[in-house]
Amino acid sequence: LLQQAEGYEHYDDMQHGFDILDDVIKKAREYAEPGAIRFAEEHKDDKVLHVMATGANYNVAYTTTTCILMECQWIHSNPIHSGEFFHGPFEVVDKEVPFLVLVGVGREREMDERAVDFLKKYGKRITVLDGKEFGIDILGATVAEYLSPLVFTGVLSRYSHRLADARNHSVYVRRYMWHVPY
């Protein structure tokens, strides 16, 4: 639509990104599997887990906290925008509070890295998922930041299922949804 309405400058790059996206997601999910297993073992007993990201990836953080951690696993969680981290949320950082950070490949990467640097200095239970490690860059410099949420969603699907397995708490179990009027 953008191409038809306005003449999108990076239309060909975006088309190429879409052409290879499935392969990038598949490889990213395979690459992520060992980390997902470690993450699940390290966090299976957690009562709270914060997820941080910025840019287009913030929506992935929001979905992970709301739909996966709170709805499916009953873990208290909060999506934190990396650009807002130093406006209050950084005050909860200590050696016990777990954070999952999605580091993007686009213009906002510097904000993600700044937050990660702080977490590594003052925290301990930090899991960093770096888009560069998942091959997001191969999608093309002009469009990778827009397609990266799709890759992170695929990767976090692995993480959520491994966490569910480690907790012996299926992602399909609900307390209220589909059971009581609301």
Question: Where do the language-model regions lie?
Answer:
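A SIS-like phosphosugar-recognition module
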Residues: 1-182
